[in-house]
Amino acid sequence: PASHTKMVHGESAAVRFEMPYLFLDRHGNRFMDEGCCRMGYLNEFTKKYLKEVDFADSTAAKFFSIVPMNWEEHYEQWKDFSDISIHNAYRNVDPEAWIKGDTLEELAEGMIAYADEEGWAHDYTVEAIVESINRYNELVTAGNGDEDFGKRDEYMVPIEAPCYAVPRGANNIDALVDG
């Protein structure tokens, strides 16, 4: 077979989750249209975070996907018209590996604890994370589309507690595979 470029990903199979939920950057802020067609551009969207740390710490590009408890229902609705995946090769994602919070504040505290434990370059605060989730939910409730980033309406679903935070990472490097 022909050689091709493949990405070396920044997270394990248990959390490699290609669904368009709310993405929060190293500051706890939403930073992009999370729609499926945008995921391939993560390296471009996260360069500014690497620049903030003078390209000295690749963990500055790490982020969280905030996921509702009923995520599997959305997968069933979206899979027929969208390039989404809950699989990595033969393995499914594992919600047991995700951070769960019964309140948004508890979720934020868990995210901060995880990022600290993993040594991420971040400045998360509970307030910033909760504010970002609340703003996203305001957009969903208003029903006027995503005025902040332009995400497609069908992907605008509420994120209410209890919910999950999935640790994510932008692709680390391009690598040559099979060649």
Locate predicted features.
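Residues forming the flavin
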Residues: P1-E131, T141-G179
